[in-house]
């Protein structure tokens, strides 16, 4: 049983796309919670909430409420996965792989993910392990990064001992978990032959964000919000996921008017 927590901030178009992709591909989550952090455009958030009545939405402002909600989520669930709202599923993850509890299970990695996006926005080729189960301490780049907050499944009993730190946003949470990776209990990571989820780093909601992002002005948060409020949605069926080769990839966005899946 897996419970999911989605981190979201002012990206209604992308959040809606992620939620619809989870439903479209029958991702087997028991529950789905969206932690909406520091949203300015609450009208857009209200639309997303109305269109996804089966999802729990929690809106918080500030660092401490964010941390408290994450800790409460971890304290009340046994196996969890985090998502950031710029990701989408393009295939159904293998339920057998997801059932592995003794390892960190990545839905963003596979034999197809031969490229790793760097902190400067470029891409470098990474060594893919020969098998679908590998020791992350011996692996390269994304395959040696066990504590991602993007589509990796954990037991909370493995996460909670690491969380002896304060954090106020998803970047701080991931960075400080990564700093403590040598204390992470599971030695192994697991994935399917092909990834099923990909992050689409077309934009960032904070000018202070150091994460690389795309520069297409039509795909920045404000432009996408206007299109979303005008009734447009990501057309998941028309987007081309046939050449996914990394965990993060700027796959072109395609839109349709008020699509529902």
PLM features: residue spans?
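Short, acidic, metal-binding catalytic loop of nucleotide-sugar glycosyltransferases
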Residues: 20-30
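Conserved catalytic core of nucleotide-sugar-dependent glycosyltransferases
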Residues: 97-166
């Amino acid at each position: 049983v897996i419970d999911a927590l989605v981190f979201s901030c002012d990206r209604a178009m992308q959040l809606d796309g992620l939620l619809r992709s989870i439903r479209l591909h029958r991702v087997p989550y028991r529950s789905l919670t969206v932690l909406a952090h520091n949203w300015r455009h609450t009208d857009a958030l209200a639309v997303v909430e109305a269109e996804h009545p089966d999802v729990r939405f929690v809106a918080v402002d500030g660092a401490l409420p964010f941390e408290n909600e994450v800790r409460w989520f971890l304290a009340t669930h046994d196996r969890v996965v985090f998502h950031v709202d710029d990701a989408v599923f393009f295939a159904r993850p293998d339920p057998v792989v997801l059932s592995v509890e003794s390892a960190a299970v990545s839905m963003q990695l596979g034999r197809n993910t031969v490229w790793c996006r760097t902190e400067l926005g470029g891409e470098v080729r990474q060594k893919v392990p020969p098998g679908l189960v590998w020791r992350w301490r011996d692996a390269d780049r994304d395959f040696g990064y066990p504590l991602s907050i993007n589509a990796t499944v954990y037991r909370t009993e493995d996460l909670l001992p690491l969380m002896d730190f304060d954090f106020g946003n998803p970047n701080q949470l991931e960075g400080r978990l990564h700093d403590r990776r040598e204390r992470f209990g599971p030695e192994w990571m697991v994935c399917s032959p092909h990834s099923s989820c990909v992050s689409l780093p077309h934009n960032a909601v904070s000018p202070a964000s150091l994460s690389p992002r795309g520069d297409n002005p039509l795909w920045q948060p404000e432009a996408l919000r206007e299109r979303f409020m005008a009734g447009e949605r990501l057309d998941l069926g028309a987007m081309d996921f046939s050449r996914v080769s990394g965990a993060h990839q700027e796959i072109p966005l395609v839109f349709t008017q008020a699509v529902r899946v």
